[in-house]
């Protein structure tokens, strides 16, 4: 029987803005899933951010973060189509449709650039 592996993702970043800090909170903190299952990761901003400036990253131990999604829903070059991003305003989601063994990692969302 296969033991579920852990999929982790965390709060990443706050950026100063003219109206104060934008705080991004991710949930849940840990997912226990097996290869082939679907993963849904949520990122909530403390105030509305432009979808144009929301990114998702994957990081594995000892490696630099890898850009997965930019502009909330656009896949970076070379990213498999099992990764998809969606959302707007304050609520954003990263979905991995069918987990592969190499997908077990830490995931971050980031607000970058400007916000309206």
Swiss-Prot record:
Phylogenetic lineage: Eukaryota, Metazoa, Chordata, Craniata, Vertebrata
Superkingdom in the source lineage: Eukaryota
Protein name as it appears in the record: Immunoglobulin kappa variable 3-20
Segment forming the signal sequence: 1-20
Chain residue ranges for the region called Framework-2: 56-70
Subunit structure: Immunoglobulins are composed of two identical heavy chains and two identical light chains; disulfide-linked.
Cited SMART domains: IG, IGv
Location of the region described as Complementarity-determining-3 in the Swiss-Prot/TrEMBL record: 110-116
PANTHER family assigned: IMMUNOGLOBULIN LIGHT CHAIN (PTHR23267)
